Regions:
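Short hydrophobic-acidic sequence motifs that mark active-site Asp/Glu residues
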Residues: 79-81
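Nucleic-acid endonuclease domains
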Residues: 1-69, 75, 84-166
């Protein structure tokens, strides 16, 4: 849906490359071509960094490839956090486990034994994640997580997106 016209004449100064979770065919073809190239040159797996490179190349964005923050690929005011997981059948996967890396309860909250109080550790990890989203949303809107589910034999792939919220 298009942005509404407002009486004060102001508009959100961002444009979405495509509607949420509706990746255009040409984008999927470009991503597929990038992944096929990696397999052709002998790659035995597709890493998270490869996924970020493939997506950035396909959208014409910049892959920050940074171990901190959640904005992995950026294009203008839009950003994506890139995740990749393996699954026996990507097209039938109903649940996947995403790892929220870049979260250190020890560093951020001084929790030296994360198993001592699981509830406290979970609350700490969620607090770190929410703060990372706050920081990313200061610079980017919309902010999405793009997940590549790949089969173990690397012959099947599925992509889906989630909007990042606190």
């Amino acid at each position: 849906m298009k942005h509404p016209r407002l009486r004060d004449g102001k508009r959100l100064q961002t444009s979405e490359l495509y509607p949420f979770n509706e990746l255009p065919d040409d984008l999927l073809v470009n991503i597929g071509g990038y992944l096929v190239h990696l397999l052709y040159i002998g790659r035995k797996d597709i890493s998270g960094s490869d996924w970020g490179d493939a997506f950035a190349d396909a959208v014409g964005g910049l892959h920050l490839d940074s171990p901190v923050g959640i904005a992995d690929v950026v294009l203008g005011k839009m950003a994506w956090s890139m995740k990749t997981v393996k699954n026996a059948n990507p097209f039938k996967a109903e649940r996947v486990r995403l790892i929220s890396g870049r979260c250190s309860p020890d560093y951020s909250y001084g929790i030296t034994d994360p198993h001592k109080d699981i509830q406290k550790t979970g609350t700490a990890v969620l607090g770190i994640w929410n703060e990372r989203i706050n920081i990313a949303q200061d610079n980017y809107n919309p902010l999405r997580t793009s997940v590549l589910i790949r089969s173990y034999d690397l012959l099947s792939y599925c992509i889906y997106e989630e909007e990042n919220h606190r």
